[in-house]
Amino acid sequence: MNNTEYYERLGVDKNASQDEIKKAYRKMSKKYHPDLNKEEGAEDKYKEVQEAYETLSDEQKRAAYDQYGEAGRNGGFGGGGFGGASGFSGFGGRSGGFGGFEDIFSSFFGGGGAQVNPNAPRQGDDLQYRINLKFEEAIFGVEKQVKYNREELCHTCGGSGAKAGTHPETCHKCGGRGQINVVRDTPLGRMQTQTTCDVCHGTGKEIKEKSTTCHGSGHEKVAHTVKVTVPAGVETGQKMRLQGQGDAGVNGGPYGDLYVVFQVEASDKFERDGAEIYYKMPMDFVQAALGDEVEVPTVHGNVKLKIPAGTQTGANFRLKGKGAPKLRGSGNGDQYVIINIVTPKNMNQAQKEALQAFAKASGIEVSGSGQKGFFDKFK
């Protein structure tokens, strides 16, 4: 099991912080970006860097990878995705998803840890909601109204689960403990174990007359709306925590939290890597040969760029401060303009004659038969 390869790809150790991982990712991503590095194998390296960062930038995926290696990333070791077409899902309880030795021993001996008071206040479950953002919305920030269903305290009983005018009583069978002792035959002999009370189902309370609204649960599903202020510069996969916007707590406990996860749509014009933006600019070979001043689109509007004579395909120019806002820190990243020289396909007679004259003056023989020659110099 190799659980260090992803760290090696980014050039960090296993104890690296998220800021160190992100900084290393930016460096390696720029080093192997296909538009900036034309060496053989650079694109594969770039994909490997993306794969490593996708896992190590997510705390749940990273924890699974640290423990199980590649199997933890691909297998069912928790760290679920988004729920449903609405982009909403719950995180479930706060007890975690893994069983351990305590679970094994408790199946025989009934316990193995401190007893939990069933009447103690407990925080409600956290929820997760995915927000789809347009490319420009992620760049500049936006306000979104998020509507989802969550568990709130029953408006009839106020969370007690009992019919109006009545109150829950201490369970007569378990005495309010939520568990009862049971004698069982096990492979180790006859053992006394503890199990969840079959009367109160672990709550320690009996409700003689249940609320007709929540049927004794104390909660009801309610459509809830919250305003989300999306900060400028967010990226796909980043999360935003909204405290107290999750499910209602139990026994007077606080509400859980809502985690908003951002999904940014791709642009048909730009590529983005953190705060850096890349734009492939098609350019006529005459402009590239003679030099020109051109208008370049950016997310901040068009800007003028001087192209020096003799510019080749793959040349890149930096437009300082024309990238995305830096989510941590101040200012913007840069935009990189990558030149893609276009050879004309359909030329009129005057254009052909002009190029033939240029070829002759350059000492280049052009057969016109489609063989490699003059035009290949501009590809």
UniProtKB/Swiss-Prot annotation:
<dbReference type="Pfam" id="PF01556">
    <property type="entry name" value="DnaJ_C"/>
</dbReference>
<feature type="binding site">
    <location>
        <position position="174"/>
    </location>
    <ligand>
        <name>Zn(2+) 2</name>
    </ligand>
</feature>
<dbReference type="InterPro" id="IPR008971">
    <property type="entry name" value="HSP40/DnaJ_pept-bd"/>
</dbReference>
<keyword id="KW-0677">Repeat</keyword>
<feature type="binding site">
    <location>
        <position position="197"/>
    </location>
    <ligand>
        <name>Zn(2+) 2</name>
    </ligand>
</feature>
<keyword id="KW-0235">DNA replication</keyword>
<feature type="binding site">
    <location>
        <position position="214"/>
    </location>
    <ligand>
        <name>Zn(2+) 1</name>
    </ligand>
</feature>
<dbReference type="InterPro" id="IPR018253">
    <property type="entry name" value="DnaJ_domain_CS"/>
</dbReference>
<keyword id="KW-0963">Cytoplasm</keyword>
<keyword id="KW-0862">Zinc</keyword>
<dbReference type="GO" id="GO:0031072">
    <property type="term" value="F:heat shock protein binding"/>
</dbReference>
<feature type="repeat" description="CXXCXGXG motif">
    <location>
        <begin position="197"/>
        <end position="204"/>
    </location>
</feature>
<keyword id="KW-0143">Chaperone</keyword>
<comment type="function">
    <text>Participates actively in the response to hyperosmotic and heat shock by preventing the aggregation of stress-denatured proteins and by disaggregating proteins, also in an autonomous, DnaK-independent fashion. Unfolded proteins bind initially to DnaJ; upon interaction with the DnaJ-bound protein, DnaK hydrolyzes its bound ATP, resulting in the formation of a stable complex. GrpE releases ADP from DnaK; ATP binding to DnaK triggers the release of the substrate protein, thus completing the reaction cycle.</text>
</comment>
<feature type="zinc finger region" description="CR-type">
    <location>
        <begin position="141"/>
        <end position="223"/>
    </location>
</feature>
<dbReference type="GO" id="GO:0042026">
    <property type="term" value="P:protein refolding"/>
</dbReference>
<feature type="repeat" description="CXXCXGXG motif">
    <location>
        <begin position="211"/>
        <end position="218"/>
    </location>
</feature>
<keyword id="KW-0346">Stress response</keyword>
<dbReference type="InterPro" id="IPR036410">
    <property type="entry name" value="HSP_DnaJ_Cys-rich_dom_sf"/>
</dbReference>
<dbReference type="Pfam" id="PF00684">
    <property type="entry name" value="DnaJ_CXXCXGXG"/>
</dbReference>
<dbReference type="GO" id="GO:0008270">
    <property type="term" value="F:zinc ion binding"/>
</dbReference>
<protein>
    <recommendedName>
        <fullName>Chaperone protein DnaJ</fullName>
    </recommendedName>
</protein>
<dbReference type="GO" id="GO:0006260">
    <property type="term" value="P:DNA replication"/>
</dbReference>
<feature type="domain" description="J">
    <location>
        <begin position="5"/>
        <end position="69"/>
    </location>
</feature>
<dbReference type="InterPro" id="IPR001305">
    <property type="entry name" value="HSP_DnaJ_Cys-rich_dom"/>
</dbReference>
<dbReference type="GO" id="GO:0005737">
    <property type="term" value="C:cytoplasm"/>
</dbReference>
<dbReference type="InterPro" id="IPR036869">
    <property type="entry name" value="J_dom_sf"/>
</dbReference>
<dbReference type="InterPro" id="IPR001623">
    <property type="entry name" value="DnaJ_domain"/>
</dbReference>
<keyword id="KW-0863">Zinc-finger</keyword>
<feature type="repeat" description="CXXCXGXG motif">
    <location>
        <begin position="171"/>
        <end position="178"/>
    </location>
</feature>
<feature type="binding site">
    <location>
        <position position="154"/>
    </location>
    <ligand>
        <name>Zn(2+) 1</name>
    </ligand>
</feature>
<dbReference type="GO" id="GO:0009408">
    <property type="term" value="P:response to heat"/>
</dbReference>
<dbReference type="InterPro" id="IPR002939">
    <property type="entry name" value="DnaJ_C"/>
</dbReference>
<feature type="binding site">
    <location>
        <position position="157"/>
    </location>
    <ligand>
        <name>Zn(2+) 1</name>
    </ligand>
</feature>
<comment type="subunit">
    <text>Homodimer.</text>
</comment>
<feature type="repeat" description="CXXCXGXG motif">
    <location>
        <begin position="154"/>
        <end position="161"/>
    </location>
</feature>
<comment type="similarity">
    <text>Belongs to the DnaJ family.</text>
</comment>
<keyword id="KW-0479">Metal-binding</keyword>
<dbReference type="Pfam" id="PF00226">
    <property type="entry name" value="DnaJ"/>
</dbReference>
<feature type="binding site">
    <location>
        <position position="171"/>
    </location>
    <ligand>
        <name>Zn(2+) 2</name>
    </ligand>
</feature>
<feature type="binding site">
    <location>
        <position position="200"/>
    </location>
    <ligand>
        <name>Zn(2+) 2</name>
    </ligand>
</feature>
<dbReference type="GO" id="GO:0051082">
    <property type="term" value="F:unfolded protein binding"/>
</dbReference>
